[in-house]
Design a protein with these regions (language model features):
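Bacterial Sec-dependent N-terminal signal peptides
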Residues: 1-31
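Short, conserved micro-motifs composed of acidic
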Residues: 29-333
Length: 333
């Protein structure tokens, strides 16, 4: 072959290979992108998973596996006092209809949380170790196995007591944060943490005045590095929800928690906000809200029964829905 032609041919082949590499890398990046990721900034809360995750039912919590491809949440049935943890998988470009999680469906279960490494899923339940219904809620967990989740196990003492324990949230080092109305608190529910040492949880410690008050604090989310804590508080003077619950944030500085701040009208509304959690990639913040079409006085009457029925049975009917917003909206420094 003519040396000149050979040189041109090699140049073309190299260029094609380079372009193919770019296309492959772009495709790989696109495929590895978490399904909840947005191509545009999300400075304002937006409804998440409408019709599948957020529905006309009372939907709360949003616990993702580390790869973001699976979400566990609670479908709540207040009238029957039943809460069921369900799971949805992201397949074929969309969230699939939820199924009952393998460890739920018989007792009242809430507040799923997947550990940062994906090895455990924590939740709270009114089940007892004897397989009967209790009068209080305890923290339970399941462990990841080759065949799925293990059988549920009680986290036991000193975490669980005869009082209620709710909303487990686990940091990267295994430290467990939770809420409880046990004796010795500041009033109502307080938020506690228990350090994992040698595979065992130590005596829980109350997070103190920066976080807890006599009003009641629960539904806590701890960042993996324990730099900040987001939680729900009730009946505080600055509660935008009239006492029904707002989300607050406190940051850990030099081992102490800063006085908590209301996240303001960008996150909170005139109704209830709770169940905070961060996404596995640390870019987004999810929470549950009861905001909807019926949380303020109507400007005009319904035209007919069909319009009333559509409003009462629609996604924004005032029951719980999951919302997503950029984590930067929290103002964490």
């Amino acid at each position: 072959m003519n040396p000149k032609k050979l040189s041109i041919t090699l140049s073309v082949l190299l260029a094609c290979a380079f372009c193919a590499g770019l296309i492959f890398n772009a495709s790989a990046q696109k495929q590895s992108k978490h399904p909840y990721a947005s191509d545009k900034p999300m400075p304002e809360p937006a409804l998440f998973g409408e019709g599948v995750i957020s529905t006309a039912e009372d939907d709360l919590n949003a616990a993702f596996t580390p790869d973001g491809q699976t979400i566990y949440f609670t479908r709540n049935f207040p009238a029957s006092k039943l809460g069921v943890i369900v799971v949805s998988h992201f397949r074929n470009g969309k969230w699939q209809p939820p199924e009952i999680a393998s460890f739920s469906g018989q007792f009242t279960d809430y507040d799923p949380f997947v550990s940062p490494d994906g090895s455990r899923l924590f939740y709270c339940s009114n089940r007892s170790e004897e397989g009967k219904v209790k009068n209080d809620f305890d923290i339970w967990f399941v462990e990841k196995t080759e065949g799925g989740w293990s059988q549920p196990k009680s986290i036991g003492a000193p975490i669980n007591t005869k009082s209620n324990e709710f909303y487990p949230s686990v940091a990267a080092d295994g430290t467990l944060y939770f809420s409880s109305n046990r004796q010795g608190g500041k009033g109502g529910f307080d938020i506690y943490r228990s350090k994992l040492v040698g595979g065992k949880y130590g005596e829980p410690e109350n997070l103190g005045d920066g976080v807890n008050t006599a009003s009641g604090e629960l539904d806590n989310y701890i960042s993996p590095d324990q730099r900040f804590l987001v939680f729900a508080a009730y009946n505080r003077p600055d509660d935008l929800g009239g006492g029904s619950g707002d989300l607050y944030i406190s940051q850990q500085q030099n081992g102490a928690w800063t006085p908590s701040k209301n996240l303001g009208p960008k996150i909170n509304s005139p109704v209830r906000e709770y169940c905070p959690i961060g996404s596995p990639d640390g870019k987004y913040f999810f929470f549950t809200s009861y905001r909807g079409n019926l949380d303020k006085p109507l400007e005009k009457p319904f035209k007919n029964y069909q319009e009333l029925h559509a409003s009462l049975t629609g996604v924004l009917n005032g029951r719980g829905n999951v919302y997503q917003v950029d984590l930067s909206a929290l103002g964490v420094q």
